[in-house]
């Protein structure tokens, strides 16, 4: 206290540690796109600020609490920032300015801010940050926070959740404006609404979570995952249990200790474990790709990751082992039969390993389900020369992966055959595997010789930490309670005596009937299910990936922060993150094993009466003969259902005994269910194109498309509309391979895609522009990011990953264009020269 008083009297500013954070403003911009001879550019025409420095977000009231300012030039907004910084210093507050898609709105002013402040950043990529701090004398004096990470579905979805819908239709983005263009009252209303949705959403979060405080926003609560972290810390961390020695400890403290004990102690161990990590099992059956089939069932696993958060013992205390010993351990793993695995599904194998193994003549296992349907397991993305990642990843994560690979830690293959993002065969390959992945490998592939090169192993297994399983149990029960509320609530007072997990503010709102049904549904779908689904992500984080730095306003990966064998010890000592990476590997590894076993059981029981077409982490698409019933599908999977239910009961026994107030029965977790396909349990027609790209037609002739890059705005003409139009006069077998095929160009009128130009922060506009009112003025501003309409090219075979698929599919690879219906013309498919194909 004396030191703080002395510094205050001397006029020193207050440090980050004793100046509290407060959301003081919400920020947004409106920009104008302008077509030049060199392409699209954009510049800002309006800066919007909702000043909330005198408002407690817990008491926020739409319109009453708002204090909205409009600025037409970037320097005016920067002056506002300067004034807010000065106010924060006087009041011992670190102000936070929140925005949605922050870097889009900071683009035209970041160079101006960089002229006055140093900057520090916590980022996912150079264009997607969590927070950006303005620094003076090494101290944070203002923080920008991107609220996008609380709900990534858009401001409109955020507004729907909190009951303040985003304004639509009042700002015509096709009109040319300048900073001097007079704006209408409707346009200003539209612009203001975006800076009102965020405080309304934050108010909603405070009302929905009794433990949450407004000073957590932008500090302790930055992302949806951090909401889960803080919920656990405030509601569960201090729950106590009695240890074997009779002493009592909190489950949170025990978890922290376990994270410290199980963290890698050397760079080699870190790199080995990182290289062993696999994502969810996403695959396409090469034998069935781009083929239209009928009578397709969709099977989903109930809460797949939670099955292995709660149903799998964790290998602990790894140590390096000689290759000869590892060889014997690995041979025992691959010789473990399916019956043994299912009988001890909580601990299916007797050893845990992280190993590097060389295989000779690796190929799909003859006579297996994976041979019958040509399904492969090993991801192409783990190999050193793979250029385009199978999944979108952050620059930091890609840099960490590349750096580890350059250090020699990567899979490699000689004469490999790749397709659909997977390795089908290789004359020789070196793989990095856990015990779960090695066992799965033995079910999918066969080989002539296997030689273990190096690795670590353990025979010690323990239950997963109660701190994490308690989160899963608690949120599963909360999810079920809210699901029940959604069925019962009709905007009248509701008897809530049956509910034990709902927070008091939610109970109060339900019992008085003040909530709308839309609010209740949004709370269930967005908040409760969002938190439930966020638990796994915490354990899968690489806490040693490099960070981002800012130089003169330019954000980039700090290459010096990448861990190496020379810097690892120092970085490990400084690391305070509590993540159990081995646990995350076993959670996702369990999900991969679950799908592998399911495929094998379906083949054993139903043989060629079914075909597994594709899978995605927790789901399978299965073509069925017309006489295959739902009951037959589930009976084939019954051994797996019994195994996971028993595994969860064994693994969760301690938590249920010591923490009954938060424990759950976890009914049906890990079990497959046959999903509705429209009004029936089968799709009439279905086609898998490649991973995560599929089209289905239900029995009511409604089309369902899943494909990255193809938006489906409500009420718009979309790819689904286009296919329905073609199906009026053509058969599914003719339409689907062309609509979702290789080298198919889909124009903006169908794809509704946007491209963007990313100017440098120093790029400026200085030109005379005539606005839509006919007024000409000189525009001098830093450039904004230009968003402009664009089409999408599907299955571009000039890209290596797509070209590899052609080994297995017989399709038309000529360039084609989808032409939408309109202006008296029917929908059709043409070649690039204009000839009509369909």
Residue ranges and their predicted role:
Residues 1-25, 29:
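N-terminal accessory regions of nucleic-acid-interacting proteins
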Residues 18-20, 35-838:
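Conserved acidic
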Residues 32:
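Conserved Rossmann-like nucleotide-cofactor binding loop
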